[in-house]
Amino acid sequence: MAVQLNLSQRKNGIRQPGSIYRALLDMTEQGMLDLQNRALEQAVKNGAEASLDMPAWVIWPESSFPISTFYRDSTGERFPNQDNVNFLSAEEDYVQALRNGICNFILLTGTDDIYLSDEGRVARAYNCLTVFEGDYSTARPHAKAMLVPFGEYIPMRETFPFLEKAFEASAGTAMGLNYTPGRSSSPVPVPIRPGSSSTVGVIPLVCFEDVVGSWVRRFVRQEPQLMVNVTNDGWFNRSCANEQHWRNAAFRCIELRRSMVRAANTGVSVALAPNGAVIADLRDSSGSPFTRGVMAATLPVGCTK
C-alpha cells in the first residue's frame, strides 16, 4: 500500500515533524480501514465470509521522515533521535499502535541519513529508501546513487556561490549540504509479509533513479524481485513532467520483466506489472493524480530473465 500526502514543494520545505508524522499515520490508518470496509461490504453483497487482504508492506514517499537519521561517521553507530524512536517504537499513537491495532506491516520509507564527525560536524548525507521491519533498531537504509543536480547537490557551488541563491528562489527552501551518492547495487531482501522467512529482493529506487535503465539493471538477480520507487515530484508543480516521469519508469518494467510500485509525495503513485501495464494508480474523480490518499495493489514478483 502506497501513501500520498500531495504536499507542495514549498510546504514540504517548511514542514513541521509532528504534522507530517500525524498526516502519514492518519492516511495509512484510513486506507487500512477503507480496505476492511470494502471487504465487509463485498461479503455482505455476495453472502459470503469476509476475506480481509490487508497490506503486508506500507510505502511512504521520498523524504517522508521529516527528522533526519544521524550516524557517527567513524563507526556507523546510529544516534537514536527520540522523536523517530517514539514514532516507530512507542506502543501508543504511532506506527506500532497501528501495527497492533489493525494489521502488522513492514514500512518502506524515504529518509535523510546524516553522518556526523566526532566533533559533531556533518561529514556526509544520503537520500535513502529505508526498510523498517519493526522498531527503529531494524532500520536498513539504501542510499540513492544517481543524484539530481540542483535538486540534491549544487555543482561547483564553492566557485559560483550565486547558484545557491538561485536554487533557494526556485525551490522555496535552502539547499543545505550536498548529498553524497550511494554505491550499492545490491537488492534489499524484504520478507513478503511480517515474520515470513520468504523474501523478495527489492530494487530500491529513489526519485529519478527509476528512469536510469543502465543503473537499475545492475540490481537484477535471478530471484523474486520487485522495484520500489519513492519519489517527491513536487518540484514539477502540476506540469506534465509528473506523467512523463512515471511513464518513463514503466519502461524499466518492460526491460527487466519486474513489477514496480511508486509512492509519490506529489505526482503519480502507481503499481505496474512486468509488462508496464497499470495494475492500480491513485487519482481523484477527475483523473488527476494530485490528490491525497492511498493505493493498494497486489503485484507479481517473478524472476524472468
Predicted regions and their residues:
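Enzyme catalytic cores with a strong preference for nitrogen-chemistry domains
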Residues: 1-305
